[in-house]
Swiss-Prot record:
Organism: Bacillus anthracis
Gene Ontology MF term list: 3'-5' DNA helicase activity; 3'-5' exonuclease activity; ATP binding; ATP hydrolysis activity; double-stranded DNA binding
Pfam families: PDDEXK_1, UvrD-helicase, UvrD_C
Superkingdom field: Bacteria
Keywords for this protein: ATP-binding, DNA damage, DNA repair, DNA-binding, Exonuclease, Helicase, Hydrolase, Isomerase, Nuclease, Nucleotide-binding
Name by which UniProt lists this protein: ATP-dependent helicase/nuclease subunit A
C-alpha cells in the first residue's frame, strides 16, 4: 500500500511522519500528534491534497471534518480557503478549484454538535420534535429539571405504602431536606446521557447489585480491588526490600535483616493469596503476625540508617494494616449482604431517574427546546436502529451518509465521548482495515474528563493500531515539536519519563511519546528550565488554611514579579520568528499558568505593586458589584417585601438614603414583625416633627414600591427594570460615581440578562430571581471582561485549561504545591462509567453507616483517573513554553518534604515507583523527586550520584533547582541611602535640601509652557455641523470657546423618553424617509405609507417617528421643480458620507496658530444628483419658517442662506475632491413652506 502513496516532494518542509499523515489512506488512521507538532497544518494539507488530487479528486462537501470548537472549525475553513486561492493563482483556469471554493461555505466542517444539528434539521420528521426547536439556555435547563423533579417527588410523597421510596428517602436525605436525593437523581441522569443507550446503562447499575446466587469472586468490584491489593502489597514489599538494603550497609543495623526477611516472606504469602482469590486474601489477612524487632544497641550503628530502616518497615506494616481495616475486616458474605439489601432501593432510585428523564424530555418537547446532549442523542437516534440481538446498527440514513462522505476527519479525538464515538462510527466504514476515518489528537493533552471526554477511546485504538496498518488501523506518531527550545523539551521529557506510565497515568511515556526537537533557535543565555521551591516557615503561616493559601499566593507572586522585572530590566532576549533575530523580552511574552484561578487576584495585585502590567480574565465579581447588588435587592423586595435583609439594604442604599440612625428609628417603631410591616404601620400614623424627613423618604419609596409591584404583575421584566432605573434615577446616579461608565454598563448587562431570560420559556420576577440564584450556585458569575489584543503588552494570567493550544516565550507554572482537588471522591455517593453506583451502606433504624465494596472500588478507580488527568494537565502546562520554563511551588517545611522526595532517588529504573506516583497529592510530589535524580540538583543536595543510573543522572537537560527562603520574599525592600535624607525631611515636614546646580532646572520645569497652546483649544477632528456653528458664533464673544467645548446633545435613552418627539428627532425621521423612499415607484400617499410601514418593520423608524411624518410635505417636494429633477436625474446618491483634510484657518475663524495646520472634517451629504450638465447638491432642512419671520420667506431667505452657506461649501469641496468634477449648483430645500434656496459663493 505504501508504494501507491505520493512521494514527498524534493525540498519539502514536511517530516516523513507528517507526510505519511498527509497522504496515507485505505484504512482508519490515528495520528498521535504531540504538543507543537503541527497537527492542524497536517490536517489542512491532507484535506487540500484530497480536494486537488489529479487522479481521484474529492469535492470538499464530501468530507466531514469534526473540530472541538466553532473557532477551530472557522479557522480550518479559512486555512482551506486560503490554500485553494493559492492553487487558483497557479491554475487560474481550474473550474474544479473554483467549484471547491464555492462549496466550502456549506461543507461539513464543524463541531460535532453542529453536525448533529444538521442531521436533525434534515430528518426531524423521524423524531418527535418541533422542527422550529431552539437550543436551551443552560440555566433555563437547570430550572426545568428542578421543576420536573419537584413534581415527581411530590407525587411519590403522596403515594400510600410507598415503602421502598421512603426507605430511599431515609437513607439518602437529611432531616431538613431531600437535596441529596435530588442530586443523586440528577447526577445519574447526567451520567447516563454520556452513554449511547442511557436506559441500558441504568439497568446495568441495578443488575450489578443483584447478587443472588453469586460469590464475592463474581463481583467486578472485588476483581478490581484485588488488583489494588496486589499494588499495595507490592509497595509494602518495596519498602521492606529498601530497608533490607540499608540494613546490609557496613554501618547498617544487621540484626534487623532476619526480621525483614521474615516480613518479606509474610508479604509474599499475602501476594500469592491475592493472585488466587478474595477469599484467600481474607483468610491470609486474619493470620498476619509481624515479628517483634530485636533490641539493638543503637550506638553500634549509624543512627540515621536505623531510623530509615525502622521507618520503612513501619510504612510497610501501615500498608497492610490499611488493607486489613478497609477491605478485610469483614467476611466476604457480609459484603454480599450489603448488595442484597441495597438492590431494591437502587432499583427504585433508577426508576425515578427514568421517570425524570421521560418527563424532562416531554417538557422540553412541549416548549420546543433541546439541549446539547439531546442533539447528540437525537442524531444517534436518526443514524441507528436496533438489530435483532438488541444491539445498535446503522440506519438507512447512516448508510446514506456513509456513501456521501469519502472521509471523516476528527480533530482533538482524545476529547471524544462515547455518544460522539457512536455517531462517528455510524457514518464511517465498518472495517478499520479498510476504513475512511482519520483521527488526530494527543491523549497526553486529554484534560476534559470533567466534560465526560473519554481518553480511553484514543488509548484503545493506539494500542490496537500498528505503524504498518497490517490487519487493522494504522497509527502515526508526530513527535517532533516545532515550538520549543531543546531545554524546554528535554526538561519536560525528563520529568514525564519518570512519572507517566500505563499503571499510574494510563499512558506509557516511551520513545514514541517523547518530544523530539523540531525547531531551531539561536544560542541563548539563561535558557535552562527552573524549579523554585519556596520554603514557608511556621512563623510565617497565618492562622487557618485559607490564610496560609493567601500567603503562598503572595510569596509566589512576589518571586514571579521579581523575576519578570529583572528579566525585562536586564534586556533578557527571546527569539522573534518574524524578524529572524533575538529581541529584548516584553511583558506580553510572559504567561503565568495556574491550575485554577483563586490565586489570580493576589498575583495581579502583587505584580501591579511592582509596576508590571497584568491581565487575567477573572470572570467573577459581577453580582458582587455594589450597583448590581443594590438593584438585585430592589427586585427581591418587589417580589417579596417581607424579606428584611434585602429591604434594609435598599433603605440604606442611595435610592432611599436612610442612615443608620434613621434605620434604627424605624425599627424602634415595631420590634416585632418584618421591616415592611413596620414601615407600613409607620406611614399610616402622623409623624413627629423630628421624624418628618424620615417619613417623606419612606413615603416616596413606599409609593414607588407599590407601583412597581403592580407593574411587575402586568408588564415584562425588562420594562420593569428600566422603569426602576428611570424612576429612582439610580442609573444616572451611578454614572456620576468613579468608574461610572462601567457601573452603567453593569446595569445594562442586568437588563440584557432579563431580556435573555424572557426569551426562554420562563416568565415573571420570582423565576428570574431563581434563575440568577442558579447562575450563582453553579459558579457562573460574570466578570468585567475586556477584549485583549494579541499585541497588548501585559503579563497574562490564565488557567492551564485556557492555555491549551497557545504558546508563550516565557512560562511560569505556579501553585505547584497546591493539593489536587479530591472533593469528588468525598461525596456520599459516587458514579463511574464502568462501575456504576457506589455509596455508603446506611441503616437508619440501627443508625449505622459504613463503606461498601462498590464505593471503595469506585473511589480507587476515580482517584487513579484523577491522578492520570492531573499528569496530563501538567504536561499541557509545561509544553506551552517556547524558550524558558520556570516552575514554582511553596511548601511549609522544605526539609521534611525533601526527605519524602528523596525516598525514591536511587530507584534503578526511569519510572519512579508506582506508590510514589500514585501517592502524590500535588504537582511538586512528581516534579521534585524527578529532578532530585538529575545532576543539576547536586549543588542543592550534595548527595552525589549514588546508585542512580548514568542515563538518568546525566540526562541531556539543563535545570536550575533552588529552595527560596520565604522570609527574604516577605521582607520589605531596603531603602536606598540617597533616599533616606529625603524621606526623613518629608516625615518631619522640613524643607527639602536641593543642590544649587539643579535650581535652574527645577525653575525651568515649573515655568515651562507648551509650545502649541492654540492647537489644544481647537479640535483636530470636526463635523461640518460643528464648523457651521463655529462660523455662526459672534466674533470675539466671551462664550465662543465655551460653545466649542459644550457636550453634544445626545439621543435620549428609550427608558427616559416622554410622549412626543423633539425637533431633532422629527428631523432625523424625515431624513430617514428621504433616504429610503423608492424613487422607481410613483410618489403617492398610499405607496409612501406602505414604505414607511416597511421601515418600521425593519426598525429603521420607530412607530412614534412614523406617526410624526408629514407625508404631504414629502409629496410636495417631489411635485416641486427640484423634486422632479431628482426623479429624472441620471443618478441619485443619498446620505453620502465623506472625510477630508481642511486647513485649520478655514475651519476656525479665530485660528491664531501656525499656518499649514490641518484638521479632519467629516460629514454626510443628504442628496446629490447627476444631470447631463453636471452635479447638483441638495440639503434637506426641517427648520420652522412659517410664522417665525414677520416678513415671511423673503425675510428668512438671506438669514438661512448665511446660516448654511459654509456647510454647503464644504459639502461641495468634498464632492469635487472625491469626484474630480465641479458642483454646478448647491440647493437648500425647506419642507416647511416648500421653499428652495440656491446658495451662491
Amino acid at each position: 500500500m505504501m508504494e501507491n502513496w505520493p512521494k514527498k516532494p524534493e525540498g519539502s518542509q514536511w517530516t516523513d511522519d507528517q507526510w505519511k499523515a498527509v497522504v496515507a489512506t485505505g484504512r482508519d488512521i490515528l495520528v498521535a500528534a504531540a504538543a507543537g507538532s503541527g497537527k492542524t497544518a497536517v490536517l489542512v494539507e491532507r484535506i487540500i491534497k484530497k480536494i486537488i488530487n489529479e487522479e481521484n479528486p474529492v469535492d470538499v462537501d464530501r468530507l466531514l471534518v469534526v473540530t472541538f470548537t466553532n473557532a477551530a472549525a472557522q479557522e480550518m475553513k479559512n486555512r482551506i480557503g486560503e490554500a485553494l486561492e493559492k492553487v487558483l493563482i497557479d491554475e487560474p483556469g481550474s473550474q474544479h478549484v473554483r467549484k471547491q471554493l464555492s462549496l466550502l461555505n456549506k461543507a461539513s466542517i464543524s463541531t460535532i454538535h453542529s453536525f448533529c444539528l444538521q442531521v436533525i434539521r434534515g430528518y426531524y420528521y423521524m423524531l418527535d420534535v418541533d422542527p422550529r426547536f431552539r437550543i436551551a439556555n443552560q440555566t433555563e435547563n437547570e430550572l426545568l429539571k428542578e421543576e420536573v423533579l419537584d413534581d415527581i417527588l411530590e407525587e411519590e410523597y403522596g403515594i400510600e405504602d410507598n415503602t421502598i421510596f421512603f426507605e430511599l428517602v431515609d437513607r439518602y436525605t437529611s432531616d431538613r431536606s431531600d437535596d441529596d436525593l435530588q442530586r443523586m437523581i440528577l447526577a445519574l441522569h447526567t451520567e447516563s446521557r454520556a452513554h449511547p443507550n442511557p436506559e441500558k446503562w441504568l439497568d446495568k447499575l441495578v443488575e450489578a447489585y443483584d447478587v443472588e446466587g453469586k460469590t464475592i469472586e463474581d463481583l467486578v468490584y472485588a476483581s478490581y480491588l484485588l488488583e489494588d491489593v496486589k499494588f499495595q502489597l507490592e509497595t509494602a514489599e518495596q519498602h521492606i526490600r529498601k530497608a533490607t538494603e540499608l540494613a546490609m550497609l557496613p554501618d547498617g543495623p544487621a540484626p534487623r535483616i532476619e526480621t525483614l526477611q521474615a516480613d518479606l516472606a509474610l508479604l509474599g504469602t499475602l501476594s500469592a493469596a491475592a493472585r488466587e482469590s478474595w477469599t484467600s486474601v481474607y483468610e491470609a489477612m486474619q493470620n498476619v503476625s509481624w515479628q517483634t524487632l530485636k533490641r539493638i544497641k543503637k550506638s553500634d550503628y549509624n543512627e540515621d540508617i536505623v531510623k530509615q530502616v525502622d521507618s520503612l518497615r513501619n510504612k510497610a506494616k501501615d500498608e497492610v494494616k490499611k488493607l486489613q481495616e478497609e477491605l478485610f475486616s469483614r467476611r466476604p458474605e457480609s459484603f454480599l449482604r450489603d448488595f442484597q439489601d441495597m438492590h431494591p432501593v437502587l432499583e427504585k432510585l433508577v426508576q425515578l431517574v427514568k421517570v425524570f428523564t421521560e418527563r424532562f424530555q416531554a417538557m422540553k418537547r412541549d416548549k420546543g427546546m433541546v439541549d446539547f446532549t439531546d442533539l447528540e442523542h437525537f442524531c444517534l437516534q436518526i443514524l441507528s436502529e436496533q438489530s435483532e440481538d438488541g444491539e445498535m446498527k446503522p440506519s438507512a440514513v447512516a448508510l446514506q451518509y456513509r456513501n456521501k462522505f469519502a472521509e471523516v476527519l476528527v480533530d482533538e479525538y482524545q476529547d471524544t465521548n462515547f455518544v460522539q464515538e457512536s455517531i462517528i462510527k455510524f457514518v464511517t466504514k465498518d472495517s478499520e482495515s479498510e476504513g475512511n476515518l482519520f483521527m488526530v489528537g494527543d491523549v497526553k493533552q486529554s484534560i476534559y474528563r470533567f466534560r465526560l471526554a473519554e481518553p480511553g477511546l484514543f488509548l484503545g485504538k493506539y494500542k490496537r493500531f500498528t505503524q504498518e496498518g497490517l490487519g487493522g488501523g494504522m497509527k502515526i506518531d508526530l513527535a517532533k515539536n516545532f515550538r520549543s527550545r531543546h531545554e524546554v523539551l528535554a526538561g519536560t521529557n525528563f520529568i514525564f519519563k519518570q512519572i507517566m506510565g500505563e499503571e499510574v497515568g494510563e499512558i506509557d511515556y516511551d520513545a514514541d511519546a517523547e518530544l523530539k526537537l523540531g525547531a531551531s533557535y539561536p544560542e541563548g543565555e539563561d535558557v535552562a528550565a527552573e524549579l523554585l521551591c519556596i520554603q514557608q516557615t511556621e512563623e510565617e503561616v497565618i492562622d487557618g488554611e485559607e490564610g496560609a493559601e493567601v500567603e503562598k499566593a503572595q510569596l509566589e507572586a512576589r518571586l514571579m514579579a521579581q523575576r519578570i522585572k529583572a528579566m525585562v530590566d536586564s534586556g533578557y532576549e527571546v527569539y522573534d520568528r518574524k524578524t529572524d533575530s533575538m529581541r529584548p523580552v516584553k511583558y506580553r511574552d510572559f504567561v503565568i499558568l495556574l491550575r485554577s484561578m483563586p490565586w489570580a487576584p493576589q498575583i495581579m495585585e502583587e505584580l501591579k505593586l511592582q509596576g508590571i502590567p497584568v491581565y487575567a480574565d477573572l470572570a467573577t465579581g459581577y453580582f458582587e458589584a455594589t450597583e448590581v447588588n443594590i438593584m438585585m435587592n430592589v427586585f427581591r423586595v418587589i417580589d417579596n417585601p417581607m424579606q428584611d435583609i434585602p429591604l434594609a439594604a435598599v433603605l440604606r442604599s442611595p435610592i432611599v438614603g436612610l442612615n443608620d440612625e434613621e434605620l434604627a428609628t424605624l425599627r424602634a417603631h415595631g420590634k416585632k414583625g418584618s421591616f415592611y410591616e413596620v414601615m407600613s404601620s409607620f406611614l399610616k400614623g402622623a409623624p413627629l416633627e423630628e421624624e418628618k424627613e424620615l417619613h417623606d423618604k419612606l413615603e416616596w419609596f413606599y409609593n414607588l414600591l407599590q407601583g412597581w409591584r403592580e407593574f411587575a404583575r402586568q408588564q415584562s421584566l425588562s420594562d420593569l427594570i428600566w422603569k426602576v432605573y428611570g424612576e429612582t434615577g439610580y442609573y444616572d446616579f451611578v454614572g456620576g460615581l468613579p468608574a461610572g461608565k462601567q457601573r452603567q454598563a453593569n446595569l445594562r448587562v442586568l437588563y440584557d440578562r432579563a431580556r435573555q431570560y424572557e426569551a426562554t420559556s420562563f416568565r415573571g420576577l420570582f423565576r428570574f430571581l431563581r434563575f440568577i440564584e442558579r447562575i450563582l450556585e453553579r459558579g457562573d458569575d460574570m466578570g468585567t471582561a475586556r477584549a485583549l489584543g494579541e499585541q497588548e503588552d501585559v503579563v497574562r494570567i490564565m488557567t492551564i485549561h485556557k492555555s491549551k493550544g497557545l504558546e508563550f516565550p516565557v512560562v511560569f507554572v505556579a501553585g505547584l504545591g497546591r493539593r489536587f482537588n479530591t472533593q469528588d471522591l468525598m461525596k456520599r455517593f459516587l458514579l463511574h462509567k464502568d462501575f456504576g453506583f457506589g455509596s455508603q451502606f446506611i441503616d437508619p433504624r440501627k443508625r449505622i453507616k459504613y463503606t461498601t465494596l462498590s464505593q471503595l472500588a469506585i473511589k480507587r478507580k476515580m482517584k487513579m483517573e484523577l491522578i492520570a488527568e492531573e499528569m496530563r494537565v501538567l504536561y499541557v502546562a509545561l509544553t506551552r513554553a517556547k524558550e524558558k520554563l520556570i516552575l514554582i511551588g511553596t511548601v511549609k517545611d522544605a526539609t521534611k518534604e525533601m526527605e519524602k522526595w528523596l525516598d525514591a532517588r536511587e530507584h534503578s529504573e526511569w519510572l519512579l515507583p508506582d506508590h510514589v506516583r500514585a501517592g502524590a497529592s500535588c504537582y511538586l510530589d512528581w516534579i521534585a523527586p524527578s529532578l532530585y535524580r538529575h545532576r543539576d540538583s547536586e549543588m542543592l543536595l550534595e548527595l552525589g550520584q549514588g546508585s542512580i543510573p548514568d542515563e538518568i543522572y546525566g540526562y541531556d537537560t539543563s535545570w536550575k533547582v533552588e529552595v527560596v527562603d520565604g522570609n527574604t520574599l516577605l521582607a520589605p525592600e531596603p531603602v536606598q541611602e540617597e533616599k533616606q535624607e529625603l524621606l526623613e525631611a518629608l516625615r518631619e515636614k522640613k524643607a527639602v535640601p536641593l543642590e544649587s546646580e539643579r535650581k535652574e532646572e527645577v525653575y525651568d520645569r515649573l515655568m515651562w509652557k507648551y509650545g502649541y497652546g492654540e492647537a489644544t483649544s481647537h479640535r483636530a477632528k470636526q463635523s461640518v455641523t460643528e464648523i457651521k456653528r463655529n462660523y455662526q458664533s459672534e466674533e470675539g464673544s466671551d462664550n465662543a470657546f465655551i460653545k466649542k467645548l459644550r457636550a453634544p446633545i445626545q439621543t435620549r435613552p428609550r427608558f427616559m423618553e416622554k410622549k412626543g418627539l423633539t425637533y431633532a428627532e422629527r428631523g432625523t425621521a424625515v431624513h430617514a424617509v428621504m433616504q429610503h423612499v423608492d424613487l422607481k415607484k410613483p410618489i403617492t400617499v398610499e405607496i409612501l405609507q406602505e414604505q414607511i410601514a416597511g421601515m418600521v418593520n425593519k426598525e429603521l423608524l420607530t412607530f412614534e417617528q412614523a406617526e410624526e411624518i408629514a407625508i404631504e410635505k414629502v409629496i410636495s417636494f417631489f411635485d416641486s421643480d427640484l423634486g422632479k429633477r431628482v426623479l429624472a436625474a441620471k443618478s441619485v446618491e443619498r446620505e453620502v458620507p465623506f472625510t477630508m483634510m481642511l486647513a485649520a484657518e478655514e475651519a476656525y475663524q479665530d485660528w491664531q496658530g501656525e499656518s499649514g495646520e490641518s484638521i479632519l472634517v467629516q460629514g454626510v451629504i443628504d442628496c446629490m444628483i447627476e444631470e447631463e450638465d453636471g452635479i447638483t447638491l441638495i440639503d434637506f432642512k426641517t427648520d420652522t419658517i412659517e410664522g417665525k419671520f414677520p416678513g415671511g420667506f423673503e425675510q428668512a431667505k438671506p438669514i438661512l442662506e448665511t446660516r448654511y452657506k459654509v456647510q454647503l461649501s464644504l459639502y461641495a469641496k468634498a464632492l469635487e475632491k472625491s469626484l474630480q468634477h465641479p458642483v454646478k449648483e448647491k440647493c437648500l430645500y425647506f419642507f416647511d413652506g416648500n421653499h428652495v434656496i440656491k446658495v451662491e459663493e
